[in-house]
Amino acid sequence: MFNLKRTPSINSGKSWMLKLGYYNITKTQTIADDWIYIIDHSIQMGKEKLLLILGVRVKDLPRDRALKYEDVEIIDLQPVKTSTGEVVYEQIKEASKKTGNPRAIVSDMGSDIKLGVKKFREFSPSTVHVYDLKHKIALLVKKILEKDDEWGEFKKFANFVAKKLQNSTLAGYRPPKQKEKARYMNIEDLVRWGDQISIKYERLQETKVKTEDEIKLESVIADIAKFEQSVEIWTEMVMVFQLIERFMNIHNLQRDSYEKFYELHEGKLQKLKTEEAKGFAIQILSFIKEQQEVCNQNERLLHSSQIIESLFGKLKFLEKEQSKSNFTSLVLSMGAMVSKSTPDILKKALESVNVKKIKQWTKEKIGITIQAQKKELHKLKRVEQKWDSTEELRVA
C-alpha cells in the first residue's frame, strides 16, 4: 500500500501504532442515544489509575458472538492519580459530550465507578447501569468457596503436587499456576485439572504392572481421592457458569433473557447431579432476571465488560517492565487495537498525525514520565568529557 523500499525499523512500527491509536482516540464520534459505555480502571504499581471508556452502539452489537476489539471505539482514556465517585462522574460526563448521553454503562461494582455512574444517572435518567456478569459470577463463586473448607485443602493439595512434580519427568501432570489476583474469576483451569487428575488416579489404580514413573505419580496424587465428591460439585458449577456465559455472549441482555435461557437449556440444568450446582445456577439466573428489567421491549444491551479487561492485558504486555513504574505514550496503542482499520483509515492516520501531536498528548494526559526523567538525567554533565580510552592506555 505504501510502496516501501526497505523493511521499517521497530521504532517506525511503534510510531505508526501510536499514530493510529491517537487518530482513533481523538476522532469525532457520532452523537446518538444508543451508545453503550464499557468502563473500568487499570491500576499500575504506582498510584496512577487509567480510566478507560469503550463504546459500542446498540445497533452495532454483534449477534451470535461476544464483542471483538474491532466492534468498539475508545471514547475516552484518562490517567488519574486519585479516583472518587465525583471524578468518575466528571469523566463520564465529559465523555458524553462526544457521543451524547449513553443508553447504558457496563462495569464491575468498584466503589468509585459505582458512585460515579449513580451520580451520572441522576444527570441522565435514561442511562441504565449493567453489572458485568463475569464479576457477579466470581462474587457468587467466592461466597461459596470461602465457606468450603474442602476448597482450601484442595488448593494445598494442588500446591503439594506442583512442588513434588516440578523439574521431574512427570512435570506435565502439575496443576495450573494459581492466580492470587481475580482468583475466583479463574477457577475453571484448576477444577478441570482436579477432574482430570482424579481420572488419571483411577486408571493408575486399575493398572496392574506400573512403570517407576507411574508408581511415583500414583503416590503423589493419591490424596485426590479425598476430594472426589467436591470435585464433582465444582466441575458442575464450572459447567453451569460456562453454559450461561456462552448463552449471554450470543444473546446479550434482553428483557426475556431469563425465560429464553430456560426455554433452551432447562433440560441441561435438570441433568445436574449435585444440589450445589443447581442452587448456583438459580443464583446466577436470578441475577440475570433482575438485570433484564433495565431493557426496553425488543432491546438488546451488553452484559459484559470482559473486552476491557482483555485490552488492559494487551497494554500490560506491550509495556512490560515499564508497567511497574507509570504510564507512557504506549497507552495510545490501545487505540490502534480497537475499531475497524482499513487501508484508507491507516493512511489518514499516518498522514494527519505527527510525533509532535503524540508528545503533546502524552504531556497533557500523562505528564513527565519516569522514562523521560531518566532520559533527561542521562544527558546531564557538569563538563564536556570525551576521553579516548585507547590514548589513555598507551605507555609513553
Go through each PLM region and give its residues:
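RNase H-like nuclease fold core
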Residues: 3-104, 111, 115-123, 135, ...
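Conserved His + Asp/Glu catalytic blocks
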Residues: 140
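Acidic, His- and aromatic-enriched active-site or binding-groove loops in soluble protein domains
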Residues: 126-137
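A polyampholytic, Gly/Pro-enriched intrinsically disordered region
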Residues: 145-165
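Short hydrophobic "helix-edge" motifs at membrane interfaces and signal-peptide entry regions
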Residues: 30-31, 125-126, 297-300
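Generic recognition of stable, solvent-exposed alpha-helical segments in well-folded globular domains
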Residues: 8-12, 63, 115, 131, ...
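Acidic/histidine-rich catalytic cores and adjacent linkers
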Residues: 110-120, 137, 160-396
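Intrinsically disordered, low-complexity acidic/Q/S/K-rich activation/interaction tracts characteristic
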Residues: 93-95, 117, 133, 152, ...
